[in-house]
Amino acid sequence: GDRPRTFNIQTNLSMTQTPAPESFLLKWRGDTLAVTLAVDPPRKGRAAFRTNIGHGDVRRREIIDETERGLTPLAKAWTDIPLAETAPGVFTGEIPLDEVGVFSGKACFFPEGSHVPEWPMGRNLHVKVESAETRADNAIYCVFPRQFGSFREVVRRLPLIMDTMGFRIVQTLPPFPVPTTYAVMGEYGCPFAATDFLSVDPAMAEFDEAVTPLGQFEELIGAVHAKGGLFFVDLPANHTGWASTLQTHHPDWFRHEPDGRFHSPGAWGVKWADLVELDYANAELRAYMADVFLFWCREGVDGFRCDAGYMIPAETWEYIVAKVREEYPDTVFLLEGLGGEIAVTNRLLAESNLDWAYSELFQTYDRSQFEGYLPAAIERAEKYGTLVHFAETHDNDRL
């Protein structure tokens, strides 16, 4: 990880940092971080907060260059922010949080006449900064466009969805073309078996000699924005459907069984036989998928549901998020971690910079289960990122 370049480390039990070292804080852009270092007994000297806050662009570029150019990160984002002595032995500072990202830092004390810092006990403090645009009012309506008939029919229903019911975020299930080679879930196949991440399914468009299917999808995005809302797309980046563009032209970008057959992913003891799993050990695939996310951002998409995101390596997400946030810093990444370990979800939120995650309270409406689950869920959410509680999803019966 990104660490301060300190080679002669001296820890001091008589120093107290607030917030405490090793804390994990969730903040929003526009907030400030108040830091205090107390030296007891007071001594002459100066104090600073060593951090990469304020240099998110440098940190993102190092992450990107590690994947794209093979360069080792050198922690160039770290710098010392002076703390002011507000009382004998008490040093304080208010640090503005102007960038979205995950940052670290730790206060240190330089005794008078010394250039060697002394540190309070413990590892770095971590601060996750999210977009102020999504601090509140984040009710999500998940749209299955096929059930509406077309993208334009969804547009016609937006007054009901956004005005009457009050949803600010409209999220579509994957809008991509699906395979005919091996399809499940009826004639049209599963929407999570995408064949082309850079197109939309023409079956969800109306015939129009002037506007392409992608253009009609753009109309939907624009209509949501016109009502002051945000538009999310479900992007199943862990896999494709059979005979996808990637499988046809880049079969080496996929996982294979020992006998050479393509590997299908699965969860809960169920094999998803209509899918083939991508292999993110391939740097070219990582770069391609980051460009897929950027393509949809340029189309106006504000956020992504990351289907089966826990199956994709944390380092890959760190790269994709860094690449996207170079151009679109407020993009929201919603992790679908159902089926994965809670520790993996925590890491993806805390280190890979994904914003939100599915709550593990899934298809449950029993009060006692809510009461038993919520205290720990709230504690996790306050540290790592919002846990989204869905009343229903496409994975369970509709209410």
Each model region followed by its residue ranges:
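Loop/helix patches that line or flank the sugar-binding groove of alpha-linked glycan CAZymes
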Residues: 180, 184-187, 381-399
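Aromatic- and glycine-rich beta-strand/loop motifs that create alpha-glucan
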Residues: 41-99, 110-130
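Non-catalytic, glycine-rich low-complexity segments
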Residues: 7-40, 126-137
